[in-house]
């Protein structure tokens, strides 16, 4: 009888542990930054900086200035200042070809655009109008519904 109870307890434990889900990787996991550590350093220095339209300092920054400064820091590559100019300075790629450093473009309204830098694992860093400099998920319903194009800056 004791062996039967032990078997049942072990079976239940194995069943429960096999069905548990592991949480999504945290934003700062090593895998997120595997291709360019400078992006991680840059993000750490700018995290939580408030959004300010037209801003380009730690007092406040907009999305295109954030991308511009990140590229200069991490890739020593000068990008144009505006979202549409960054769009024009990059080449379209297929979603399946994405890699860290690609630019994600969103149409947030009929005439407004937003840009961020793809990291890995469905995540991108950007200057959010409501939350400042953060990492968001591309599969977030809001961002997924606003997604427009993914593009690559040729180095």
Where are these regions (language model features)?
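Glycine- and charge-enriched low-complexity intrinsically disordered segments
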Residues: 143-155
């Amino acid at each position: 009888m004791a062996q039967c109870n032990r078997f049942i307890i072990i079976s239940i434990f194995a069943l429960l542990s096999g069905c548990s889900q592991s949480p999504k990787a945290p934003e700062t996991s090593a895998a997120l930054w595997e291709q360019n550590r400078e992006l991680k350093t840059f993000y750490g220095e700018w995290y939580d900086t408030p959004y300010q339209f037209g801003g380009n300092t730690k007092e406040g920054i907009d999305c295109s200035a954030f991308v511009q400064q990140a590229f200069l820091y991490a890739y020593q590559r000068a990008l144009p200042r505006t979202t549409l100019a960054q769009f024009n300075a990059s080449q379209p790629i297929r979603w399946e070809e994405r890699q860290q450093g690609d630019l994600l473009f969103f149409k947030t309204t009929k005439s407004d655009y937003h840009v961020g830098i793809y990291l890995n694992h469905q995540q991108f860093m950007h200057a959010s109008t409501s939350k400042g400099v953060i990492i968001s998920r591309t599969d977030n319903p809001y961002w997924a519904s606003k997604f427009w194009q993914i593009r690559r800056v040729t180095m």
